[in-house]
Amino acid sequence: MTVKLKKPKKYAVAKNATLLAAFGLIGSLSLAKANDELIKLEKEPGQWVMQNKNYANTRYSELNQINTKNVSRLRLAWSFSTGALRGHEGGPLVVGTTMYVHSAYPNHVYALDLTQKPYAIKWQYTPVQNSQAVAVACCDVVNRGLAYANGKIFMTTLDGQIIALDANTGKELWKMKHADVTKGETITGAPLVVKDKVLVGVSGGEFGVRGRVGAYDINTGNRVWLAYSQGPDEEVLLDSDFNKEFPQHGGPGDGTKTWPGEQWKLGGGTTWGWYSYDPALDLFYYGTSNPGTWNAEQRKGGDNKWSCTIFARRPDTGKARWAYQMTPWDSWDYDGVNEMILPDLTVKGKKTPCLVHFDRNGFGYVLDRRTGQLIEAQPFVYVNWAKEISKENDRPVEIPEKRTKQGVDTKGICPNSMGGKDQQPAAFSPQTGLFYVPTNNMCMNYEGVEATYTAGAPYVGANVLMYSGHEGKDDYYGAFICYDALKGKRVWEIHEHFPVWSGPVVTAGGLAFYGTMDGWFKAVDIKTGKVLWQQKLGSGIIGNPITFLGPDKKQYVAVYSGVGGWFGIAVAQNLPPDDPYAGLGAVGVAYQAGLPKATTVGGELYVFALE
C-alpha cells in the first residue's frame, strides 16, 4: 500500500494558536484536560498510552487473558515493516483502536487502524531532517518512541526536533528545534507529556555538549523553560528548598565549583533516558549522563555535578526539588539515564513512596522520591570498581586501582561502560513486589587519553576494550533477572549469550515478555523464571514489548525486531572486526560474542495472540 507523505511545514506556530496563547487561553483550557486524560488512560489495561505503560514506569499490565497456563498457544497474528533498518528501540503506543508505530532514522511514524483486519494505515509521516545527524549519533540512529496527549502525537527526531502531529489525521501541528546537530547534539529519547507540557531531553555526551531538559507547550510548541544539568544555579534551576533534607547530596553552586575552570560548559550530563512523574507530589524524575570528556583527569577537581545524577523537578517551572549523584567524578562512562520506577514499597513496616533505579554503574538504588533520601543501594550485577555505597555519606566507596587514568590502561573493570544495564527499562510487578531487569555481563580495559574540543566532533578521550563478565571468565554476556530491590538480592536469573537489550513487560497473567539480541522473543513465569514460550524473529530485539486489547477484546503482545544500539552497532553499520576499539568498544565485544553471525539488520513490528 502506497501512502503519500505529508510535506512538513516550516518551523512556525500556527497564527491562531499563537494568538490564543497570547491571551492565555490554551494553557488554562488544556492543562487539566491533558493530564487528567493521561492519568485515566494509563489505568486502562487495554491501552498502552505511554512508552513505559504509566507515569510510574512500571511496565506492568493488568491483562491476564494470556497467562502461564496458555502462553504456549501464542502465535503470530500479524507483522508490519517500519520501512527503516537499524536499531529499533522503544515500543508502539495503542490509544483507543489506533496503534502508533515509530522507526529508527529517518523516524517514520505510522497510525494503524486496528478495527481493520489485521490493520489499515490511517496515515504516515516522515519528517524532513538534517542528514548530518547520522554522522554525530553516538550509538546508532535509534529512537525510543512517541508520546500521546490531548489528541496529539509527539515525536522527536535524530536531528533535534520536537514535533506535534494530529493523532487522527497525522497533520503537522507544530515543530520546534531543541538540539543543534552542528554541535553534536541529537535526540534519541522519547518525550513525556506532563500537564500542558511535553518534556524533551538531548543526546550527545560524547561530543562535549551541555545536557538539558526543555518543556514545550503542547498546543503552541512555545518553550516554557529550560533546565541545564550543570552550570550556574539560575541555569540549572535550583528551587529554594533544593536538597534541604540532605545537603550532603550537594547544593547551590555545585554546578560550577565541582568542575575545573569552565569545563562544565563541555560537561555532558545529557538527558537521553526515560522520564517518570508522580502526580501526587507533582515531581518528575530523570537521570543525567556521563560528564565530558571520558578522560576524568581533564575534569579533575571535584564531583562534576550534576552528571550521573537523578533529578526531581517541578514540571510547571523546571526547578529542581532534589538531586542525588550516583557516580561522583565519573571515570568509567556510567551514565545515570536509566528509568526511574516509582512504586510504593514497605520500608521498615511503613508504606513509602519510592524511586527505584538500576544504574549503569551496577548498583540498584532505592530512594524516597519525596526527598531523595537513600534507602538502599546494592549491586545487581558483578561490580568491582566500588566496594559499596556508604551508609555514612551515600557515596560509592571506590576501589582505587579501578579508577581510570590518562595514559594508563586500567584492566578488568566491571561492569563495562555499557553498564550493569543500559537504557533498556526494567519492570515492576505489584503481584510479586519484585523487579524484572534486563542486564549486561561485561567488563573492560579503559585508558584515558587527552581530548581536544571541536564543535560537532567527537570529544571522547578514552580507549575502551570490552569483553565478557567476571574479567572475561564468563561465557555469557547478559542475563534476565528477577530482583528484590530492598533486599539487594537476585531471586532467579536466566543467562543469555548476548546482553539483554529489551525492556520487559510483566502482566497479571504471571508472565514477563522480553527479547534477545539474536532475535528470540520469550515469555517466562515471573515467579520461577521458567521459559514457557519463545519465537525466533527476523532480527535481534532491542525494542520493549507491550500488551493491549484489540477491538475484538482479545489480548495481544507486540514487539519491535531490529538489531542495533550500542552493543549492536557492528551489525547495524556492518562494521569490520579490524578495530576492537571501534564503536566506543562495541565492535570488539560484539565480534567476540559472535553477534554478526547470529542476526542481521531489520525493522519489523510483530504482534502475537493466542491461537
Swiss-Prot record:
Main localization of the protein described in the UniProt heading: periplasm
pH dependence (UniProt free text): Optimum pH is around 7.
Domain of life: Bacteria
Protein name as catalogued: Lanthanide-dependent methanol dehydrogenase
CDD domains: PQQ_MDH
Catalysed transformations (reactions): 2 Fe(III)-[cytochrome cL] + methanol = 2 Fe(II)-[cytochrome cL] + formaldehyde + 2 H(+); 4 Fe(III)-[cytochrome cL] + methanol + H2O = 4 Fe(II)-[cytochrome cL] + formate + 5 H(+); 2 Fe(III)-[cytochrome cL] + a primary alcohol = 2 Fe(II)-[cytochrome cL] + an aldehyde + 2 H(+)
Gene Ontology cellular-component terms listed: membrane; periplasmic space
Function in brief: Catalyzes the oxidation of methanol to formaldehyde or formate in the presence of lanthanides (Ln). Is a key enzyme in methane/methanol metabolism, allowing M.fumariolicum to grow on methane as the sole carbon and energy source. Can also act on other primary alcohols in vitro, such as ethanol, 1-propanol, 1-butanol, and 1-hexanol, but is not able to oxidize secondary alcohols and acetaldehyde. Uses a specific cytochrome cL, encoded by the adjacent gene in the locus, as electron acceptor.
GO biological process entries: methanol metabolic process
The enzyme's E.C. designation: 1.1.2.10
Cellular localization per UniProt: Periplasm
Catalytic class of the enzyme: oxidoreductase
Assembly information from the UniProt record: Homodimer.
Misc. comment: Growth of M.fumariolicum SolV, an extremely acidophilic methanotrophic microbe isolated from an Italian volcanic mudpot, was shown to be strictly dependent on the presence of lanthanides, a group of rare earth elements (REEs) such as lanthanum (La), cerium (Ce), praseodymium (Pr) and neodymium (Nd).
Cofactor details (free text): Appears to be able to bind and use several lanthanides. Binds one lanthanide ion per subunit.
Originating gene: xoxF
Temperature impact on function: Optimum temperature is 60 degrees Celsius.
